[in-house]
From Swiss-Prot:
Catalytic residues, chain numbering: C149
Function summary: Catalyzes the NADPH-dependent reduction of N-acetyl-5-glutamyl phosphate to yield N-acetyl-L-glutamate 5-semialdehyde.
UniProt pathway: Amino-acid biosynthesis; L-arginine biosynthesis; N(2)-acetyl-L-ornithine from L-glutamate: step 3/4
GO cellular component term, pick one: cytoplasm
Protein name per the record: N-acetyl-gamma-glutamyl-phosphate reductase
Gene: argC
Lineage of the organism: Bacteria, Bacillati, Bacillota, Bacilli, Bacillales
UniProt superkingdom: Bacteria
Database matches in Pfam families: Semialdhyde_dh, Semialdhyde_dhC_1
Organism from which the protein derives: Bacillus cereus (strain 03BB102)
MF-aspect GO terms: N-acetyl-gamma-glutamyl-phosphate reductase activity; NAD binding; NADP+ binding
The reaction(s) this protein catalyses: N-acetyl-L-glutamate 5-semialdehyde + phosphate + NADP(+) = N-acetyl-L-glutamyl 5-phosphate + NADPH + H(+)
Entries under SUPFAM superfamilies matching the protein: Glyceraldehyde-3-phosphate dehydrogenase-like, C-terminal domain, NAD(P)-binding Rossmann-fold domains
Subcellular location per the Swiss-Prot or TrEMBL entry: Cytoplasm
BP GO terms, sorted: L-arginine biosynthetic process
Amino acid sequence: MKVAIIGATGYGGIELIRLLEQHPYFSIASLHSFSQVGECITNVYPHFQNVLVHTLQEIDVEEIEKEAEIVFLATPAGVSAELTPKLLAVGLKVIDLSGDFRMKDPFIYEQWYKRAAAKEGVLREAVYGLSEWKRSEIQKANLIANPGCFATAALLAILPLVRSGIIEEDSIIIDAKSGVSGAGKTPTTMTHFPELYDNLRIYKVNEHQHIPEIEQMLAEWNRETKPITFSTHLIPISRGIMVTLYAKVKREMEIEQLQQLYEEAYEQSAFIRIRMQGEFPSPKEVRGSNYCDMGIAYDERTGRVTVVSVIDNMMKGAAGQAIQNANIVAGLEETIGLQHMPLYL
């Protein structure tokens, strides 16, 4: 099946290229860029030399439609909203890595993203692409809104608790830490090496755009869920996310019950690995893979559950989950083309 990538020179784009070039069923028909049209991808990123030869093309929907069946949009917020209706109109399936179609309510999108929302008709058509929790909807979708990286790690950690109804709806606290690639390719003072090396920075306190995305998904499983407390930090690693989730249970529980809850929730999910009781993962243990590893603890003294969730923000948090969703759309096994062992060193 032929695919196209728009926004091929960003970090999400080059991770899509790396994965798709090794995929046994998908092949790259074309790569598209806004700023580097006419350049060979190997001139922009020499690590692709002798692996693929593609010239970066301008975005011509009619030409893309002739060559591809699925389009991956690795474009900034706002750009996808403009392009997607045109791509859908010619019968292409779209997997969007931006936040433009994650929110069903355009007012909420505009409130958090500070820009105009996509057309409501297209928003209604979009399916939120959290693969493990939306499989049946993704199978039939023409437009998939790939989840945000923080949202992916957080939702995979909290949804078993929310679905089971065992936690207080107003008790969810999420502490999230990300490597610098999550901030994208465009440099800023905060991501500048001297600013972040040997340092730790909190940002977007109570204002991160993944907050409404998480709350929207939680409300699908429990309408009583209240607003969450969510903080995000940059740490001096290139890729990886660690989310530490806290929630208060409604009644006394045993850690064995919580462990069983998670093991049963994800027993059919090849990319979710639940650690043994008392063990907790680190981002290094999933780097370069599509895995989400989790460890669970319970504090009898406070009645709080702690869940630690780690992913590679470029893989399960972006390109890896996008291809997992493409596999579902194409009727393939979810794991095809994504069976990479983590790169520990």
